[in-house]
Structures are given as C-alpha cells and as structure tokens.
Amino acid sequence: MIMAEKVRDLRSALERLKNMPGQLAETDVAVDPMAELAGVYRYVGAGGTVKRPTKEGPAMIFRNIKGHPDASVAIGVLASRKRVAALLDCEPENLGKMLYHSVEKPVAPVEFQGSPPCQEVVHLATDPDFDLNRLVPAPTNTPDDAGPYITLGMCYASHPDTGLHDVTIHRLCIQGKDELSIFFTPGARHIGAMADRAEELGQKLPISISIGVDAAIEIGSCFEPPTTPLGYDELSVAGALRKEPVELCHCVSVNEMAIANAEYVIEGEVIPGVRVQEDQNSHTGYAMPEFPGYTGPASDQCRLIKVKAVTHRRNPIMQTCIGP
C-alpha cells in the first residue's frame, strides 16, 4: 500500500482519511460535548458497540464545539481495521502480523529538537483562569457518565527506582479545575506499578498525558504484559510501526517527557495516599460506557492527578472514542 504523505501526527492522519472515500465526515454544526457529541457519532459512525453484524462507519470531526471556540473534536479515527491499516501503511489482512513483529524490532523514542508543536500555547495551573473544563473539550458520552472523560490520553511516566519509561492509556475523568482521576486496573498496568512504588516512597509521580497523536502511538500504547513486560517502553513499538522514532519533549511544569507532536498535553503529578470516588460530582454510580456495550460502575479507588499545566497546538484537535 503506497500513500502520498507519511502519517506522523493526528493532522496528517486526518488528511489521509479525507482522501479515502467514505472514511471521514466533518461538520460545522454546533454540538455540545455533554452527551450530544457521542450521540451524533453513534448514528453517523458505526452504531452501537455490540450490534452484529459489525458495521463500518466514517471517522468524524466536529468543528464547532460549544464552549470551546478554538478547538475541534475527532472521534472514531481507529474504529475500523481498514482505517488502522491505511494509517500504518499496511494491508488490512497483514495488520496482525505487523503488530506481532513490531515488538521484535523496537525503535526507541528520541528527543525533539527545537520548539515542540504541543507547546505552541501554554496554560499553567497558577494562572487565575486555569480550568480543565474550559481548556480541554473532553466529551461526556452519556448523561450517566461520571463526568467528562479523556479516553485517548497517552499516559507517560518513569519508574521511581529505575527511571525506565512507560506509556499506557487509562480512563481519565475531569474532577475539578486542576484535578483528574485516573483508574489503574489492579496488577495489570505498568504506570499503576510506578504509582504504587512512588506511593511506597511517599513521592508524587510526575506524569504527562498526550492527546491527539498518530495511530502507531495509540496502538503501541495498548500493548501490555506479558508481550511487553515492566520496563519495556511501548513507544518503541510505536516507533517500529511508524518506521521512525517517536519524538519526545520536556514538560514545562513537571520532570517528565511528553509526545512532541500531540495536540494536547496535560502535565501533572499522581498524589500518594489519595483515592477519589470517580463519580463524586455526578453521583450516578457509573463511570463510562465500556466497549462490550454496558456502562461500567464508578470506582472508589481512583488515583488523583494534580494538574500543573495544559499545553496544546494552535486550534487543537481533541481526539476521543466512545468507550475505552
């Protein structure tokens, strides 16, 4: 499969989809991120998550987000094998083999040289008007959700003892103007182990959350043990998939790195000794829709991230999905 422009970030990915008939829909109609955006996409896209036969619908860009005049929201970018294969320069029938072999030939990330795109605009938590709800157009998919969810945030952190890095995707809910909850599946995720060790040491764990990246990074971030054991940086898988290293930059407010070509980066620290109720604002008892088709229960064991900064590109594109 030969494509014109190489996919290196979300914007080049969307440009590629524009050139594929039926794979991307755009709208300038105003849409509310509170329970409306996801509902629209359910009907324009592939429908419900468990309906059979499985349908293929287009990805979608919402250009007019209520409350966020300078931002757009992209959804469903990875919602079909055909799209994922196209974004990775692969035939759909060879996608599984490509993912398998990517672990065998990792390409380590490198440091970005110059001014990173993700830091074109910087908001510090010390700014008087700082508010995650205003800065990040995270959708609330249903009225029962615990709050606005970041479903495609690439969480990047380092082990307190070894300094080894890891990237994973976790469910993140905006809890306040400078607070996020993060859910770690017990015993299953690398950054959860890092946060546990930092807590044992009585330390905060610096973390960056990069939103709006290319498909290789998102898919690489989903690799888990035993395929990629603790200490294996999954950005090396992404590098193998995209056939060039992922570029990282230094955060502006915490001692950690972030993905330089991301649309948004949220910087913060996982606070030791603190657990929060996921639905502490909505009191619905639910978290968010899960991919099998049900709404998952809210956790009372979420860790708390105290946000220190939000950086983003000019006219940023929030990337999301319905369900994790």
Model-derived features: positions:
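Extended, highly charged
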Residues: 2-304, 308-324
